[in-house]
Amino acid sequence: MNALGVWGQFFSMAILGLVLWAAVSDLLFRRIPNAAVISIVLVEAAALAAAALGGNGGAALGLLQSGSVWAVGVLIAGFLLYLTGRMGAGDVKLAAVLSFWAGSDALLFLILLSLVGGLMVLGLPLLRMIETNTGFWAERLGEAFGRPLECTPIGLLGGEAQKGLPYGLAIAAGFAAVQFGVFSHIF
């Protein structure tokens, strides 16, 4: 968040690291850890506090206002998608907390994650191959370092287990594009 200054950029990088954790977990296990989502919320709260204490309270208040509206809207829409089986609860929570941080860029974030999700559907065979290879190497790395995975990656189970999309990847891609200003010259 450029509005929050240098600290905002620092906190954005921390959030991107947590988003990467959520996306990899979603790819491997079709599960976004609550710990990742809660950690993002805590980083966002710390960023707002740092901005307010650092004399940038106006920017913090602006983000709090616009971000809250977007987050609540995404939670409501996401809850309806969850009820119909179209989206997982972890995806909804992750999209909501990232919509908060995106603030005034939340619409662009939501458009981008939808577009990336659509591309994932078109490239489903490639996605399945990536899931299988990632799962294979994650297991091998765990064994090599003496820390085997607690459960089998979804890509190695195949069949019905691979049903659905790891939408955390689309959420992460959309968020990263907004944070790095990939489309800022267009919008």
Task: Describe each PLM feature range.
Residues 1-187:
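A membrane-topology feature that recognizes alpha-helical transmembrane segments
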